């Protein structure tokens, strides 16, 4: 069981490093955020089932709801930015630039 948690922690850290490395493109950042949320969901689900804390069984579903909202808003922002500027660079999201 410890190797599963280790793999999930590595997946989370790789996705976090992907956010830090590929922060210039919005699509890459969104994919890395989805990887982080997926690893958190699986880790939370395994922890709840392993320790039999069924009073917290709704927490992974709430995390999935927030993840879906984040993905929807992120994709809407990606479409709006790519239509307005022709690319998906994060620097186009700065409102101070004209």
Swiss-Prot record:
It is an enzyme of class 7 (translocase). PANTHER family: NADH-UBIQUINONE OXIDOREDUCTASE CHAIN 4L, NADH-UBIQUINONE OXIDOREDUCTASE SUBUNIT ND4L. It is a multi-pass membrane protein. The lineage of its organism: Eukaryota, Metazoa, Chordata, Craniata, Vertebrata. Its main location: mitochondrion. GO terms for biological process: ATP synthesis coupled electron transport. The gene is MT-ND4L. One of its GO terms (cellular component) is respiratory chain complex I. The chain crosses the membrane at residues 1-21, 26-46, 59-79. It is found in: Mitochondrion inner membrane. This is NADH-ubiquinone oxidoreductase chain 4L. Belongs to the complex I subunit 4L family. GO terms for molecular function: NADH dehydrogenase (ubiquinone) activity. Signal peptide: none annotated.
């Amino acid at each position: 069981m410890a190797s599963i948690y280790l793999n999930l922690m590595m997946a989370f850290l790789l996705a976090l490093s992907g956010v830090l490395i590929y922060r210039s493109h919005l699509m890459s950042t969104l994919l890395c955020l989805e990887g982080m949320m997926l690893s958190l969901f699986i880790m939370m689900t395994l922890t709840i089932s392993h320790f039999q804390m069924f009073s917290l069984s709704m927490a992974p579903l709430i995390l999935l709801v927030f993840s879906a909202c984040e993905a929807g808003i992120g994709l809407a922002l990606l479409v709006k930015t790519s239509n307005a500027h022709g690319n998906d660079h994060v620097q186009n999201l700065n409102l101070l630039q004209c």
